[in-house]
């Protein structure tokens, strides 16, 4: 058996969305599972809509997901000479012909067919027309599609699919301006690049019989095809921006880990028993096309958040820290003056579903604040809190070995000494140290904030209470 070779071939007319990312992942996994090769091809024949910005977005998304490619990126716009050479060869062999039909004729034909309830298709007027035309006249080139028989292919996901050749008209393969069309470029690329398995969305099923017929006319091998179902929103409608169908890089910006998004995407159609959590190594080992479901999958943001929370708390903190550093930088926080990011992840991981949420909630570890949260201060920085804060300040100041255990002992001994519950000490201390009413355990939080900064903030809270007393 020849080496398995797959490809991901996006059109750079927009960002890399989740559907495209899933297709890329499935193609990548199939090649990696079979120790084959994965090709990246940019199908940029739509010159009006293709942009460099979109190409960059595709590359950024692939790199962020760590879907590396063995060949490419190939660009179709750089291969026009090759496509036109193949078209000229087909003209010589009689597998293609020049069509001189005017736009007006084709539009009138279409209107007549639709009025008669027929499927619009080219009527073959120039297919066997003996009339001679000057090749310099404006014309397109059409593929001479077989008029009898059927195209049958065994879809690796859906099983046998059959199209009657009578349903397929003669496809334009070169436009009037001399540029080759999408369906023809795809065929030549898959042939030249020795693609063995084409894994793509179900919206390409109708292109497949046309492409197979062109491949056969060229004497080229026909690859295996696998068409994955679309992704729906949780309301059963086609996924769109209102469902959260944004670019892959938007998920990065929103604080998702690539491992979480990959795990989520692989399960949108593929399964292995009841298993939900898959490392990339497990995906590679277990992946197969016959385990992909034919039916559409529904996108569920809550499930993605659950997976992201799982990976935040189970991946090596050093790995998560690399991604968290970017989010903290986006918040304008200098993380050099505070706890190590690996320690921050251990502190906040259980409380945060995304890295963005973590970055937004960690500022007090690295920067002083000008004021306390109004509700938290009103509730906990009252005159009754002055004595607990003064006593715990003294005990914290006397610590020579700043550990979570010693911090906890200082808080506990303050409560014991004043004969009050831990909350009477811990809550005012939390608000004093963090500026807010919620945080991880007050002892580990204060330990991470550090001794000098904690003592300074307690003094700030005592001043706040004193001002409050004078105003009352």
From Swiss-Prot:
GO terms for molecular function: ATP binding; glutamate-tRNA ligase activity; tRNA binding; zinc ion binding. Its EC number is 6.1.1.17. ATP binds at residue 241. It comes from the Bacteria. Binds 1 zinc ion per subunit. One of its GO terms (cellular component) is cytosol. A motif ('KMSKS' region) lies at residues 238-242. CDD domains: GluRS_core. Its cofactor is Zn(2+). It catalyses: tRNA(Glu) + L-glutamate + ATP = L-glutamyl-tRNA(Glu) + AMP + diphosphate. Keywords: Aminoacyl-tRNA synthetase, ATP-binding, Cytoplasm, Ligase, Metal-binding, Nucleotide-binding, Protein biosynthesis, Zinc. A motif ('HIGH' region) lies at residues 10-20. Zn(2+) binds at residues 99, 101, 126, 128. It is an enzyme of class 6 (ligase). GO terms for biological process: glutamyl-tRNA aminoacylation. Its main location: cytoplasm. It is found in: Cytoplasm. InterPro entries: aa-tRNA-synth_I_cd-bd, aa-tRNA-synth_I_codon-bd_sub2, aa-tRNA-synth_I_CS, aa_tRNA-synth_I_cd-bd_sf, Glu-tRNA-ligase_bac/mito, Glu/Gln-tRNA-synth, Glu/Gln-tRNA-synth_Ib_cat-dom, GluQ/Sye. Belongs to the class-I aminoacyl-tRNA synthetase family. Glutamate--tRNA ligase type 1 subfamily. Catalyzes the attachment of glutamate to tRNA(Glu) in a two-step reaction: glutamate is first activated by ATP to form Glu-AMP and then transferred to the acceptor end of tRNA(Glu). HAMAP family: Glu_tRNA_synth_type1. Monomer. This is Glutamate--tRNA ligase. It comes from Photorhabdus laumondii subsp. laumondii (strain DSM 15139 / CIP 105565 / TT01).
């Amino acid at each position: 058996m020849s080496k398995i070779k797959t490809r991901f071939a996006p059109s750079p007319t927009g960002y890399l969305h989740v559907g495209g990312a899933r297709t890329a992942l499935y193609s990548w996994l199939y090649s990696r599972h079979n120790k084959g090769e994965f090709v990246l091809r940019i199908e940029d024949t739509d010159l009006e809509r293709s942009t460099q910005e979109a190409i960059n977005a595709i590359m950024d998304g692939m790199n962020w997901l760590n879907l590396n490619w063995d060949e490419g990126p190939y660009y179709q716009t750089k291969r026009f000479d090759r496509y036109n050479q193949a078209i000229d060869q087909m003209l010589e062999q009689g597998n293609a012909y020049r069509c001189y039909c005017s736009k007006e004729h084709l539009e009138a034909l279409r209107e007549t067919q639709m009025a008669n309830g027929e499927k619009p298709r080219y009527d073959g007027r120039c297919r066997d027309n003996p009339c001679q035309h000057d090749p310099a006249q404006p014309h397109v080139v059409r593929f001479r599609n077989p008029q009898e028989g059927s195209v049958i292919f065994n879809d690796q996901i859906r099983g046998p699919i059959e199209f009657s050749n009578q349903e397929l008209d003669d496809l334009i393969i070169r436009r009037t301006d001399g540029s080759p069309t999408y369906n023809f470029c795809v065929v030549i690329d898959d042939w030249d690049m020795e693609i063995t398995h084409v894994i793509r969305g179900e919206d390409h099923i109708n292109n497949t019989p046309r492409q197979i017929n062109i491949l056969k006319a060229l004497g080229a091998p026909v690859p295996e095809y696998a068409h994955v179902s679309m992704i729906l929103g949780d309301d059963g409608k086609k996924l769109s921006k209102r469902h959260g169908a944004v670019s892959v890089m938007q998920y990065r910006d929103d604080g998702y880990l690539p491992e979480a998004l990959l795990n989520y995407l692989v399960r949108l159609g593929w399964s292995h028993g009841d298993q939900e959590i898959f490392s990339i190594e497990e995906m590679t080992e277990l992946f197969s096309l016959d385990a992909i479901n034919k039916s559409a999958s529904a996108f569920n943001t809550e499930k993605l958040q659950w997976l992201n929370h799982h990976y935040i708390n189970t991946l090596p903190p050093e790995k998560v820290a690399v991604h968290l550093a970017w989010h903290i930088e986006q918040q304008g926080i200098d993380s050099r003056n505070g706890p190590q990011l690996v320690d921050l992840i251990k502190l906040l991981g259980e409380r945060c579903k995304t890295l963005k949420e973590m970055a937004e909630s960690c500022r007090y570890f690295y920067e002083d604040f000008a004021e306390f949260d109004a509700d938290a201060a009103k509730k906990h920085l009252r005159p009754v809190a002055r004595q607990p804060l003064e006593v715990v300040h003294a005990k914290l100041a006397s610590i020579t070995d700043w550990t979570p255990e010693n911090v906890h002992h200082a808080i506990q001994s303050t409560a014991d000494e004043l004969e009050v519950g831990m909350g009477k000490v811990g809550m005012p201390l939390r608000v004093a140290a963090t500026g807010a009413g919620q945080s991880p355990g007050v002892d580990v939080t204060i330990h991470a904030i550090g001794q000098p900064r904690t003592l300074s903030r307690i003094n700030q809270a005592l001043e706040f209470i004193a001002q409050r007393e004078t105003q009352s």
